[in-house]
A protein has these predicted regions:
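Active-site neighborhood of phospho(di)ester-bond hydrolases with catalytic His/Asp-centered motifs
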Residues: 5-7, 32-37, 63-68, 93-97, ...
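Beta-strand-turn-beta hairpins that frame and shape the catalytic cleft
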Residues: 1-4, 99-110, 169, 224-229
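Active-site-proximal loop/helix segment associated with metal-binding centers of metalloenzymes
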Residues: 109-171, 176-187
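N-terminal active-site segment of His-dependent metallophosphoesterases
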Residues: 1-64, 70-79, 137-140
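Short amphipathic alpha-helices and their capping/turn segments at secondary-structure boundaries
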Residues: 20-24, 51-56, 93-105, 109, ...
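Hydrophobic alpha-helical segments and helix pairs
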Residues: 78-134
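Binuclear metal-dependent phosphoesterase catalytic core
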Residues: 102, 184, 191-210, 218-254
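Active-site environment of divalent metal-dependent phosphoester hydrolases
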Residues: 10-16, 40-44, 69-79, 99-102, ...
Length: 254
């Protein structure tokens, strides 16, 4: 099976939509995994975007893992639950904390895996990062404690899904970055890193996970941690020229 993957397409921006219209993904996979930040699911135009028609026609199955931007139309995170899904086309679905079987011997574990913000960095992070103005938790704006609560929920789901898996091949797909080993040196020491990255390196190294697909950082850094290949294929912001390392046909073959 060929599992194609990409993330951070940011179709909410005209520059990104135009770029992908003229430079479409190369449909070389059986399944397409999109690891977050594709568009705003609360926008009335989200499901109408022509990208979904194209993706539906070119892949047997399209799996979307929501990133933080998916919730930027004041989506209420409190409405999410393990196994939540949103059908976009007949074979295109967005999943939150869900295990998706791919054939008889492959499982894809899909979770946003929010990162984790330390108390000392919380004030500045809430002041700077748009998540805390554009996402809700109940009737209140998202704050760092709820952000961290979602991290714990996602990680607990992930641990249980991995422990319970009988699959020969386990693939994890998250939006947030699962280790500082995957962080670009330019961000080292930033007090905003807690909104992007969480250190799970020891967990990954001890796990049976074969591949871990991630996004969010707009920097594509691949690294083997233990026996797990951590891979990323983010388009990023075209208007900021972040798309240079994007590969229109990146695949995992199993």
């Amino acid at each position: 099976m060929r599992i194609q993957y990409a993330s951070d397409l940011h179709l909410e921006f005209s520059e990104n939509s135009s770029y992908l219209k003229h430079n479409p993904l190369l449909a070389v996979g059986d399944v397409l995994v999109l690891a977050g930040d594709i568009g705003y699911i609360g926008d009335d135009n989200y499901s109408k975007h022509p990208f979904w028609d194209w993706a539906s026609q070119n892949y047997e199955q399209v799996i979307v893992i929501p990133g933080n931007h998916e919730f930027y139309k004041l989506f209420d995170l409190n409405k999410l639950y393990n196994g939540w899904s949103l059908k976009i086309r007949e074979n295109v679905t967005c999943y939150y904390n869900t295990v998706i079987p791919l054939g008889n011997d492959i499982e894809l574990i899909a979770t946003t895996l929010w990162a984790h913000i330390s108390l000392q960095d919380a004030y500045r992070t809430e002041s700077v990062i748009s998540d805390f103005r554009r996402i809700r938790y109940g009737v209140e704006p998202l704050d760092f404690t709820r952000f961290n609560d979602e991290h714990y929920r996602c990680f607990k789901f992930l641990e249980e899904a991995v422990n319970n898996s009988k699959a020969k091949h386990i693939i994890v797909a998250t939006h947030h970055v699962p280790s500082f080993e995957l962080m670009s040196p330019e961000f080292k020491g930033s007090d905003l890193n807690g909104a992007f990255t969480v250190e799970l390196g020891d967990y990954i190294a001890a796990s049976p996970i074969e591949y871990w697909i991630y996004g969010h950082s707009h920097r594509n850094i691949d690294k083997v941690i233990g026996n797990t290949s951590c891979v990323s294929n983010q388009l990023g912001y075209v208007f900021s020229n972040e798309h240079g390392s994007f590969d229109r046909g990146r695949c995992i073959e199993l």
